[in-house]
């Protein structure tokens, strides 16, 4: 199977979304690629993105490595910011659980703090929801905000023939693709 049939077709979903826009500060900056939304702010832009860890949560539970999902959640978001040239500034989290679990939340919190430290951004808030009718186990997501000067936005339009590409070996699948990896 491919990713769109195993999980969700992100690109199809994005094509279905129509934005509400304003003019001046707060006006959306259109990007054809990337996972961060940008809005004008003076000569700069606020970059924002929301992401979760997905089905890697199941693997983290099996390996008793829950603290890693906090790090992964921050990384998934801040990586989306830096891909457009934005410096990560702030992160907020959302954790939904089927029942209160102080030990689980402490481990997730330690991971979130470490992820923010590694990303050089502030952990500035969050929400914990106890939703036994909707959630079985737990889920985590977060939102990152960053800043970039508008003339420094990376959008792919300045790529040209003859540019040097640098490829780095990945240390692993990070937090993407676990739905397929587990199959």
Q: Where are the language model's segments positioned?
A:
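Glycine-rich phosphate/pyrophosphate-binding loop regions near the starts of catalytic domains
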Residues: 15-171
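Short, compositionally biased
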Residues: 178-183
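Single conserved hydrophobic/aromatic residue that forms the stacking wall/gate
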Residues: 1-7, 11
